[in-house]
């Protein structure tokens, strides 16, 4: 018996099984739970985030063409909220300008506009010559008691002040309109008043169904007040609109065919310079820097072309640069500090553009989730909502990774390309960008400097460094390409889309 019990203990100790009904004791269950639990090393393992170079998320499939969802979904590069998330206040000047530019053509709006201009003319025209305070009503006519404000200082909810003020207002309105328009407005009001019950009084002490209900908003009052206060306000608004439309038309006149040719030419130039770098000549690293410069300008031109056509940006091209640059700088001891600094500077540009595009995507996914949460009462149950939530989480991981690499690369490049080193190695470049630079152009080593400024600085520094080394080098990147890039950056700054 003793041997059997010992065998059972050994078997139970080395081969744990689930407890049966007869062994459901408190101590035994605790021991068995500890033996069958997951090891602590598995729980403490860190999750493996995706690499910042290789994309792990498929591209989002947005509706193409004239879809019914096109008006609801916000643009990938537009930070504005869709129309369902908020309403513009009537006090804002933007809403006033929009109402002036896009009037409605329905009957109720036309009626309210004629009432605003003709009510004071009709009231003033029926005053007596002796200056009586009460207007004279002809037979068969009924006074309209509507809450239309002729002026905030003269009339409050249909109750007039004095006949003198009304006469002055009538003279002002007569100067602003012709006699034919006044007759048309008066006839319009008389025809509309004929439909009102004859039992209504002047002060409006009648039933609610007999009162005239005008379709007037606060924006109409404010437009009338601004027009009376400043007659040239409408001209100023139209001038601003013409200026804005002119700038939009200039922005839309981008020669996309020429940009495509430049893009293809720079890609071929980058491939040629990469082949020269692979030959491992005397200054092979200079060809590698020129190849990266050609690729960077080509990819940024493609980005700006997409922004000008309101197309979504892509990171597929930008993600190929970090792997190539990191392959070139893996042996940092054999490279000159100038070449190392330029490599890290261009690496920071690539990660910064990836960061900007991920910001646009994460904002787009956030707006989609906000819309789904607002529309659905049972929560995020659809497959599209769950997909947007997954995209949001994965974009957040890639956003943090690209930002970390972007900051690290820019700091590394700035530490290598110091002011003392640039002034001693390339004095002409130093005088152009640090001594005689314009006030509105940022420094090329700034963490948020435009790509055009950084590319021009890198191109000049590379050519001057090659000349100092006594070597003959022909760059495939033209100055016209850099100037074209800078002009497009001024028209479409990336900051306005973030």
Swiss-Prot record:
Renumbered to this chain, the Polar residues biased-composition regions fall at 35-44, 111-126
Q: Where is this region: Disordered?
A: 1-48, 99-134, 190-209
What would you give as a GO molecular function for this chain, any one?
A: transcription elongation factor activity
Its Gene Ontology cellular component terms are: nucleus; super elongation complex
Q: Where is the composition biased (Basic and acidic residues)?
A: 99-110
Q: Which Pfam families match?
A: Ebp1_C (PF21204)
InterPro entries for the chain: Ebp1_C
GO BP terms in the entry: transcription elongation by RNA polymerase II
How is this protein named in the record? Answer: Uncharacterized protein C6G9.15c
Origin organism of this chain?
A: Schizosaccharomyces pombe (strain 972 / ATCC 24843)
Lineage runs:
Eukaryota, Fungi, Dikarya, Ascomycota, Taphrinomycotina
């Amino acid at each position: 018996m003793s041997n059997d019990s010992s065998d059972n203990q050994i078997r139970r100790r080395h081969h744990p099984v689930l407890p049966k009904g007869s062994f459901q004791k408190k101590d035994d269950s605790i021991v068995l739970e500890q033996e069958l639990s997951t090891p602590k090393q598995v729980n403490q393992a860190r999750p493996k985030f995706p690499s910042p170079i290789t994309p792990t998320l498929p591209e989002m499939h947005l509706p193409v063409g004239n879809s019914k969802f096109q008006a609801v979904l916000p643009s990938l590069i537009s930070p504005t909220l869709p129309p369902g998330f908020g309403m513009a206040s009537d006090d804002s000047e933007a809403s006033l300008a929009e109402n002036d530019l896009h009037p409605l053509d329905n009957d109720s709006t036309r009626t309210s506009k004629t009432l605003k201009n003709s009510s004071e003319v009709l009231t003033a025209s029926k005053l007596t010559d002796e200056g009586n305070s009460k207007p004279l009503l002809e037979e068969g006519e009924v006074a309209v008691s509507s809450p239309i404000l002729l002026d905030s200082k003269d009339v409050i909810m249909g109750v007039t002040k004095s006949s003198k003020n009304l006469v002055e207002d009538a003279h002002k309105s007569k100067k602003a309109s012709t006699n034919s328009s006044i007759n048309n407005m008066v006839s319009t009001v008389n025809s509309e008043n004929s439909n009102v019950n004859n039992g209504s009084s002047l002060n409006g002490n009648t039933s609610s169904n007999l009162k005239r209900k005008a379709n007037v908003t606060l924006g109409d009052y404010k437009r009338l007040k601004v027009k009376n206060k400043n007659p040239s306000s409408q001209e100023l608004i139209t001038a601003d609109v013409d200026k804005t439309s002119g700038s939009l038309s200039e922005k839309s006149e981008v020669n996309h065919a020429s940009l495509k040719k430049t893009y293809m030419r720079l890609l071929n130039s980058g491939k040629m310079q990469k082949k020269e770098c692979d030959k491992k000549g005397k200054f092979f690293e200079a060809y590698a820097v020129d190849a990266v410069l050609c690729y960077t300008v080509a990819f940024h031109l493609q980005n700006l072309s997409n922004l000008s056509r309101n197309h979504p940006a892509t990171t597929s091209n930008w993600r190929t640069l970090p792997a190539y640059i990191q392959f070139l700088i893996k042996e940092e001891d054999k490279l000159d500090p100038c070449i190392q600094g330029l490599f890290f500077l261009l690496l920071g540009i690539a990660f910064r553009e990836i960061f900007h595009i991920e910001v646009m995507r994460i904002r787009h996914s956030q707006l989609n989730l906000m819309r789904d949460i607002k529309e659905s009462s049972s929560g995020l149950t659809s497959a599209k909502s769950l997909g947007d939530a997954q995209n949001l989480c994965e974009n957040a991981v890639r956003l943090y990774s690209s930002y970390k690499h972007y900051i690290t690369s820019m700091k590394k490049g700035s530490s290598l390309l110091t002011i003392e080193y640039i002034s001693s190695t390339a004095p002409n470049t130093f005088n152009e960008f640090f001594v005689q630079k314009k006030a509105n152009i940022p420094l090329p080593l700034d963490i948020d400097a435009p790509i055009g400024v950084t590319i021009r600085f890198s191109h000049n520094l590379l050519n001057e460094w090659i000349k100092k080394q006594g070597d003959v080098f022909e760059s495939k990147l033209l100055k016209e390409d850099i100037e074209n890039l800078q002009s497009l950056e001024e028209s479409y700054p990336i900051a306005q889309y973030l």
